[in-house]
Each structure stands twice: as structure tokens, then as C-alpha cells.
Amino acid sequence: MRVSQILNPTLREVPAEAEVVSHQLLVRAGLIRKSAAGIYTYLPLGLRVLRKIEQIVREEMDAKGGQEVLLPIIQPAELWRESGRWDLYGQELMRLNDRHNREFCLGPTHEEIITDLIRGEIRSYKQLPLLLYQIQNKYRDERRPRFGLMRGREFIMKDLYSFDRDEAGLAESYKKMYDAYTRIFTRCGLSFRPVEADAGAIGGTGGTHEFMVLAESGEAAVVYCPDCDYAANVEKAECKPAPMAVDAPIGAYRSVDTPGTKTIEQVAEFLKVSKSDLVKSLLYQGDDKLILVLVRGDREINEIKVNNALGPFINLQLAGPEAVLEKLGCEPGYVGPIGAPKNLTVVADLEVPLMAKAVCGANAEDKHYVDAVPEKDFRIDQILDLRMVNAGEPCPQCGSPLKEARGIEVGQVFKLGTKYSKALNAVFLDENGAEHPCVMGCYGIGVSRTMAAAIEQNNDKDGIIWPIPIAPYHVIVVPVNMKDDQVRETGEALYQELLKLGVEAVLDDRDERPGVKFKDADLVGYPLRVTVGSKTLANGEVELRDRKTGEVQLVKVEELAGRIQGMIREALNIG
């Protein structure tokens, strides 16, 4: 391809609305253009990157026995009502009505549709296991679309669904996909880490892993152990509690005045105690239940753990100041567990019962209790892991200090079990004619998100640094002066030779200054750049520059194409 023929409108200025590097560079490099908030058009070079990622995904899915299908984007509401997710999914579900006023949604995910297909087609255990996948546009009505392709309202995903006879079969399918994902992201040239994760709105109780591309700009925090294989999203990470030492004899708890102290920090400062000596008490409302959640004062409540632990209360929300005043008679900053009403369920984090004594709110303005002993001076109805984990805490598997990193989620694998097959009656008959629900797994990759994550991990001040396997083209040939016959003709000859060897090459045939060509090449991120100039040609050589390392080599013209072919084949792991 010739640069003069490519629709590649590069920009020198950073777009005002682009907050993260990937969004900035996708727009500046002429790979995407915004059509509406969270909705983008892929321009030719951007689409080439996307298709390369898709091809890697297809090859690895096919290698594991996956069969590609194409499911509808528009899904009938009755299927979502059958699964119970029509109301559960909330405002992020894009809903619409046809001319007959029938309700539909634009699919953010396809569990209902695929399960409906299977219940109509699968009859016998002989038809299992089955792995079906698609690469499809998805839709989510984000309240605030941001970060370009990282959080859009329209995005491209690969989702594969596995159907097995039993849990053992599901475990085998899960391992296949886990291994396939490891190969996919390795082939894409990305640094990543699989971590334990929360199942979110898709649900299921069998476990799940996220695949995180490591990048400082990542919106998710992960913790990992350098001494064993433990790694988890902070939303899921297990906490290993440790008892606190007692520094003085404990008497009966007593009330003290704490005027104007509404935060943990203010109370600790006023009483001259550590934040870890306090109990943080937060009131939640869920359906018709009131729940008081307790954690140590120096910890943060993990609301995902709270919601998962108290699963039946799907509408669990933090109570506002008016609700706290009505139920407990005080402002939120003075809430505490002592004397909690009987209709209040008190749920404590694992560390709270290990506190020898504690400071807690007295459910009265400007009052706190000191020297309160958990489970002696106030009741605890349930003890659960409810807090966020922090770097430096002991690993729950081996006890070594955990480390923290930032990551971008690009894939997730779920063990769904029978959540959807039972709800939608997707069953099969075993050898004895007995009926069983299919045991399901779900495995998603954010294809468009992977493209953005690759840029977040591979960029510098000059632009994108594409890994060779997913670069729009592998090499750009740049004749520095198109008016010089020798320079122009040598550039053309090298370009044609590279094409004959199967190298994906572009020729910058524009009548532009060398600096403009070099800036565009670096901005777009071609892995290799061949510079053809009269000075080096005088010695029968051209420059070969590696975009990632910046290394420049002088290579004989007659050796160049073979050298580049070898480099590309090595990067693509072609023997």
C-alpha cells in the first residue's frame, strides 16, 4: 500500500476530550474517529489492527475445538426475563421497542440467546461437550463513556460458551480457554497477568479469572504474590486477618464526647488513637433489610464483597444521611454497633472480632464509645471477608507480602455452572435417560479494548509502538526525496521486493519533507522503518530503524528485504 492512497488523517495536537494515552494516539494516528459519545468509526489502519487481533483470537479458539457462530445483536426481552436479568441489569442495558411495541435490547452479552439456541438443539449427552463462539459488536449504555475504546457504548468482543455434562467437563473446558487466552495475549505481544476476579452481572458460582494487561494507566488494581502464583483483582483479593496486640487492661466501655468529629481521621486525632483502633460502621439498605457493615477504621469496605456475601439483597445500597437519621437517630459519622436495633443485621469483617478493644460511634451526635469489646459489648450476626486488601499484607496462600500493580482488563473466563441452563431449561438426557441441565462456561475477550490496551502498554512521546503481530503494517519504506530519481526508484524497488517476500509493507510516496514522514511513521507506530536517502545510497546502503529500541542499522540494499523477512518471521514465531 502507498501512504498517498491511505485514509490516514494524522493530527499533531492532542484532542481535548482524550484523557488517556491510547485515546489520544488512536485519534492522532488516524486510526479511529468519534461518531458519537462512546461510538467510533475505525479507519483503514485501525481496522487492520483490529482484524489482526481477531485473527489471532479465531486461530486459538479453533485450535481448542471452538466453532464460530454469529448471534443476533437485537435480543427479545422475554429471554432476559426468563433469566431474571431484564430488571437486574439496570440502565446500562440498551432497550428498544419495535413498531408492535414488543420489547428488545441491544446485547451487552449473549448468555440468554446462546442458551435459548442450545435448549432447542441439544437433546443427548452424545452432543456434548460443545464450544461455540462469536466475534460481535456489543452495547452498553454507559453513563459516562470515556477513555476512547476502553469504555465505549459500542465495543467488539469475542465470547465463547462451553456446554458440558458435568463439573469435570466444565473444568476441562475452562482450562482449555485459560490456556488459549494465555496464548492469545502472548501472541499479541502483550505483558499480562491472569488474576482471580468477581463474576459481576454475568454471575455464576464456579469461579472466574480476569486477564489484565499491565499498564500504569490501568483502571483496575491487582495484587499478586512474588513468591507463589497468587494474583487477584483487588475487588476479589482475599484478606488474611491478624489479631491486634492489647496495650493496656480493658475495663467496661464508656461514652466520651467527640464534638464535631464525623470522620475516622477526625475521631482518631481527637482521641489520640490509631485509625486501626476504630470500628467503621456503615448502614446499608437492601430490599426490606437493614444491614450494618463493620470494618476496622484503617480499612476500606469492599462493596462487591458485601453484595456477593449478602447475595439475596440485590438492591443493596449505602443509606443516605436522611435514612441513617430515621433508622438510628444520628448522622452517618456517629453510627455504631452497640445497642443496634434487633431488625438490623450486623455483619463484620474478619478483623473486627480480633480487635481486643475498639472505638465506635454511639449513635448519638458528638458521642463515641471507647474500650468496646467486639462480640461482648455488641453483637455480630455474620463474620465475613468484606474489605479491600492492600499491598504489603500477607498473601493468603503463602504469607509473603503482596505487591500491587495497575491493569487493564482485556479478557475474563467464567464458570457459570447451571445458572442459565436451569433458568432457560437447557437440558440433555444422559445414558440412562435422566434429564440434566447443561453445565456452562463463558469466556470473553474485549477485542477493541485489547487494541487500546496494547497502546497503553506500548507508546512513547512520539507515538504508538505496535508489537509486530498486531501492527497495521510491519515496515514502512521512506524515500526522503521523491524528486531524486535514484532515491525514488530504490524505494519503489525495495517496497516491491518486500511484498514479494510476504512482508506487509507500505511506501511513503508523498512529496513531503522527511521530518513530516518520520513523525507520521513514529506516530502510527510501524515496527520497522527503512529510510532511503542519497547519502547512504552512495555506499549502496539504507537505514533500518527499530521503532521499539530506536536502534538504527546501515544495511546493504541487496540484503535488506531478506533481513526484514527474517525479523518478521521470528517475531511471528514462523519457523
From Swiss-Prot:
User: According to its record, what are the GO cellular component terms?
Assistant: cytosol
**Recorded domain comment:** Consists of three domains: the N-terminal catalytic domain, the editing domain and the C-terminal anticodon-binding domain.
What family does this belong to? Answer: Belongs to the class-II aminoacyl-tRNA synthetase family. ProS type 1 subfamily.
What Enzyme Commission number(s) appear in the record?
A: 6.1.1.15
Q: Does the keyword Ligase apply?
A: yes
- Which branch of life, at top level? Bacteria
Q: What is this protein called?
A: Proline--tRNA ligase
What catalytic activity does the UniProt entry give for this protein?
A: tRNA(Pro) + L-proline + ATP = L-prolyl-tRNA(Pro) + AMP + diphosphate
Q: Which residues form a coiled coil?
A: none
Enzyme superclass (EC): ligase
Q: What keywords tag this UniProt record?
A: Aminoacyl-tRNA synthetase, ATP-binding, Cytoplasm, Ligase, Nucleotide-binding, Protein biosynthesis
Identify the main location: cytoplasm
Instruction: Name the job this protein performs.
Output: Catalyzes the attachment of proline to tRNA(Pro) in a two-step reaction: proline is first activated by ATP to form Pro-AMP and then transferred to the acceptor end of tRNA(Pro). As ProRS can inadvertently accommodate and process non-cognate amino acids such as alanine and cysteine, to avoid such errors it has two additional distinct editing activities against alanine. One activity is designated as 'pretransfer' editing and involves the tRNA(Pro)-independent hydrolysis of activated Ala-AMP.
Biological process per Gene Ontology, one example term: prolyl-tRNA aminoacylation
Gene Ontology molecular function, alphabetical: aminoacyl-tRNA deacylase activity; ATP binding; catalytic activity, acting on a protein; proline-tRNA ligase activity; transferase activity
Q: What Gene3D superfamilies does its record include?
A: Anticodon-binding domain, Bira Bifunctional Protein, Domain 2, YbaK/aminoacyl-tRNA synthetase-associated domain
**Subunit structure, per the record?**
Homodimer.
InterPro entries, sorted: aa-tRNA-synt_IIb, aa-tRNA-synth_II, aa-tRNA-synth_II/BPL/LPL, Anticodon-bd, Anticodon-bd_dom_sf, Pro-tRNA-ligase_IIa, Pro-tRNA-synth_IIa_bac-type, Pro-tRNA-Synthase_IIa_type1
Q: What gene name is given for the protein in this entry?
A: proS
Where are the bilayer-spanning segments? none
Q: Where in the cell is it found?
A: Cytoplasm
